[in-house]
Amino acid sequence: MSDISTHMISFEGAGKSNQGHLAVPTGAGPWPGVVVIQEWWGLEAHIKDVANRFAAAGFVALAPDLYDGKVTTEPDEAQKLAMSLRQNWDKALAVIQGAINFLVDHDDVAPKKIGVTGFCMGGGLTWHAAAKLKQIGAAVPFYGGGPELSPADVAKIKAPVLAIFGALDQGVSPEVANQRDRMMNLANIPHETIIYPNAQHAFFNDTRAAYNAETAADAWQRMLALFKDTLVTSQ
């Protein structure tokens, strides 16, 4: 993508220095900012590519490394890494807050409300970020698992939510999707819940067997539309 620049950056969060993949459009800013939260594999090529796609669409995108450099393609190892992170969920959220703060402070980012999206484990973190972190302008969790959200947590969400699920997902089931939808309805959270009928878990990841190109393309356009409506037009 010749119309963007990318590099690894350092930012402060959770009381330490963290690394992240930053993708920025070329040309004159400012642009809205988006944090992209990894799956359980780590900060690998697919997540970096999602950040790059955001930059090509006119966003400054930062994908924080929640595993401190560890990346795997083996499910057993990914599960171990994810379980370790889950035991330090609040620390991971603090790193994500650091990534949000980095974008808020970035000269080329405006407005100072940041979009957040994540996939699988990152989807779960997106839910919790929307409920617990500051400076979030919109949230798009993809098939987000992780620690359950209570109705009290959901009631703290202040930003619009686009919640994306797959009907064939055996891990984060349609029942979970419907439960989250009911909680957002009760809390009067502006939201849309989409359960794609022919989509499995990880349908957005074009490096995985579950990838569904048509569904992924539709989800991408819906996500861009939300971020443009809530972030770009508020400048």
What annotation goes with each model-predicted range?
Residues 7-109, 202-208:
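Serine-hydrolase catalytic machinery in alpha/beta-hydrolase-like enzymes
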Residues 118-122, 126:
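Gly/Ala-rich beta-loop-alpha elbow adjacent to hydrolase catalytic centers
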Residues 157, 163-165:
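Short beta-strand/loop motif that positions the catalytic acidic residue
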Residues 108-119:
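Alpha/beta-hydrolase fold nucleophile elbow
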Residues 173-183:
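Short alpha-helix in the alpha/beta-hydrolase fold that links the catalytic acid
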